[in-house]
């Protein structure tokens, strides 16, 4: 049954499912990436401050090996000397430890982002189940981790062995060099060896990152029924409903604005409302509303109209009536046919004047808007 259930999970996880998994601490992690970048950070710190650390180490070794009769006879003085050497050692190592801690905390953010979840550290009896433990031991994930560990050990051993083989004479010469020079040269060899190891691990780490991400997505896959159930659950969420309605309004507004350039005329009020009308006598039974809006939306409609050189007519009663009693994409109400007919007649006269010249057509006034359709109270509305 479990196999059938897994086989049915053919759909990619939704954003909601991914977010829920994240809240539970389930995000892709690559230990190999963390290890490699920590090694790289350590090498970078050694490269920057290694020489000064080598000099401090040489001085500490010389001081520690210096024979002093006073220290042998004075236990307190000896303890103070040992404490001072330990303090100097810790101070010298602070840059390395601090850098490694910062990298160890920052690297996981590359894959899963910043996450502080208490779910991952909660006590769970299922994790202590011997059967579940055996399943994890013999799972494909465990097999992949085993093969990865073997490959990593083999690769690191092979790269390190080749490096030692090629640099063996230089390593032998360190034995005859002065202590400070020998420490500096040894440090350079260590940095170079680590760099070679990092470069050798890079392809494997890249594969591991890809594997961890795909495994995480595969583990969260859903069945079609789970997606339907999730959608139904989210439909009841008022926040989700509000977000969906907001997105729908934004999409409708974008579509509406995209049609403004097709309008024959824009009727305005002149600051509160704007309605874009289109009429094609061969294809339409009545004029159609392409766009309408109040406030900022009305202003944008007027701006688009000006950009496309669409005639604008200030007719407050008609603009209010069209805004309140018509819908975008629908024909205007029959009660407004007469008023809109006068507007369209003016538009046609305006087009003829632009082609042929002559007297400028007079804008229509006192349009016949029936009582009850014109709401004289001008409100600043937003669509």
UniProtKB/Swiss-Prot annotation:
Bias (Basic and acidic residues) ranges: 7-27
Organism name: Yersinia enterocolitica
The encoding gene: flhB
Disulphide-bridged cysteine pairs: none
Keyword Transferase listed: no
Keywords: Bacterial flagellum biogenesis, Bacterial flagellum protein export, Cell inner membrane, Cell membrane, Membrane, Protein transport, Transmembrane, Transmembrane helix, Transport
Region ranges (Disordered): 1-27
One example of a Gene Ontology biological process annotation: protein secretion
Its biological purpose: Required for formation of the rod structure in the basal body of the flagellar apparatus. Together with FliI and FliH, may constitute the export apparatus of flagellin.
Compartment(s) of residence: Cell inner membrane
Keyword S-adenosyl-L-methionine attributed: no
GO cellular-component term (any): plasma membrane
Record membrane topology: Multi-pass membrane protein
Pfam families according to UniProt: Bac_export_2
Top-level taxon: Bacteria
This protein's name: Flagellar biosynthetic protein FlhB
């Amino acid at each position: 049954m479990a196999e059938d259930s897994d086989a049915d999970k053919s759909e990619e996880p939704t954003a909601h499912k991914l977010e829920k998994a994240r809240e539970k601490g389930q995000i892709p992690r690559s230990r190999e990436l963390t290890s490699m970048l920590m090694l790289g950070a350590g090498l970078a710190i050694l490269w920057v401050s290694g020489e000064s650390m080598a000099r401090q180490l040489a001085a500490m070794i010389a001081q520690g090996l210096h024979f002093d009769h006073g220290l042998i006879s004075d236990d307190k003085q000896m303890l103070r000397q040992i404490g001072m050497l330990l303090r100097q050692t810790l101070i010298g190592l602070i840059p390395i430890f601090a850098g490694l801690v910062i990298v160890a905390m920052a690297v996981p953010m590359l894959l899963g982002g910043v996450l502080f979840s208490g779910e991952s550290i909660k006590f769970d009896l299922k994790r202590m189940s011997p059967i579940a433990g055996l399943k994890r031991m013999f799972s494909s994930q465990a097999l992949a981790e085993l093969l990865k560990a073997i490959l990593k050990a083999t690769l690191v051993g092979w790269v390190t062995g080749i490096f030692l083989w090629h640099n063996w004479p230089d390593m032998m010469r360190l034995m005859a060099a002065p202590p400070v020079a020998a420490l500096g040269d040894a440090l350079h060899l260590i940095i170079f060896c680590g760099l070679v190891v990092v470069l050798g691990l890079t392809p494997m780490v890249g594969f591991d990152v890809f594997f961890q991400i795909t495994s995480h997505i595969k583990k969260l896959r859903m069945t079609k029924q789970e997606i339907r159930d999730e959608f139904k659950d989210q439909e009841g969420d008022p926040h989700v409903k509000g977000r969906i309605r907001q997105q729908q309004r934004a999409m409708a507004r974008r579509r509406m604005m995209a049609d403004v350039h097709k309008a024959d005329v824009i009727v305005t009020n002149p600051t509160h409302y704007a309605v874009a009308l289109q009429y094609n006598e061969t294809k339409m039974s009545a004029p159609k509303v392409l766009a309408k809006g109040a406030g900022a939306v009305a202003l944008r409609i007027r701006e688009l109209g000006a950009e496309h050189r669409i005639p604008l007519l200030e007719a407050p009663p008609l603009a209010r009536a069209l805004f309140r009693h018509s819908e975008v994409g629908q024909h205007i109400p029959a009660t407004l046919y007469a008023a809109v007919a006068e507007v369209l007649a003016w538009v046609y006269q305006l087009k003829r004047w632009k082609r042929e010249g002559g007297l400028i057509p007079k804008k229509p006034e006192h349009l016949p808007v029936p009582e009850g359709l014109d709401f004289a109270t001008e409100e600043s509305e937003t669509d």
